Amino acid sequence: MKKTIMLAVAFIACISIFAQTKDEKYAEDVQSIDAILNAYYDVISGSSQQPWQFERDSYIHSKNAVIIRLDENGNTNPHTLESEYIPMGLSPRQDFYEIELKRNVNHFGNLAQVWSAFEIRTDPNITSDIRGLNSIQLHYEKGRWFIDSWTCEMESEKNRLVSDFLNEN
């Protein structure tokens, strides 16, 4: 009888520990602009041995978030967050780290716009020349921040946008 009671208590304890809702697991990620931007870079970064963080990434974005990438000619490719996951899920994960270099935040009321320069690395401790600039739009609703969209352009020989951004005051 004691074993049965102990097993039942252990089972209930496990359920309460492991059955956290997304709100409980990721609440700290969306409490401030800094927190959500740190989570934004954290979810994409990691070693090939770490799992993708699709659930957490989805949580920090609004339901209809739009992602836009500009190619070297300025052409766009807007798509949904779910579309972003398809190529990731189809190939093995590689060591990939997006390291933020500089952030400028404009925040008015429940709206925020963030410029964020980043560098792509295969080792978090070794710098690279692969850099880009994100324009990230957020809104505050129901006690938390959401990423509504982001637009990314990579630096190239023709367009030194990250260098220009880093040199701004």
Question: Residues of each region from the PLM?
Answer:
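A mature extracytoplasmic/lumenal domain signature
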Residues: D71, S116-F118, T151
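Surface-exposed, charged secondary-structure patches
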Residues: V66-I67, T76-P124
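N-terminal, post-signal-peptide region of Sec/Tat-exported proteins
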Residues: S48-T76
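Bacterial Sec-dependent N-terminal signal peptides
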Residues: M1-E24
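A short, polar/proline- and glycine-enriched secondary-structure boundary/capping micro-motif
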Residues: P78-T80, N125-S128, E157-D164
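Short, low-complexity N-terminal intrinsically disordered segments enriched in polar/charged residues
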Residues: A19-F54, Y59, N167-N169
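Short beta-strand edge/turn micro-motifs at domain boundaries
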Residues: R131-L161
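Hydrophobic pocket/interface hotspot
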Residues: Y40, E55-D57, A65, V114, ...
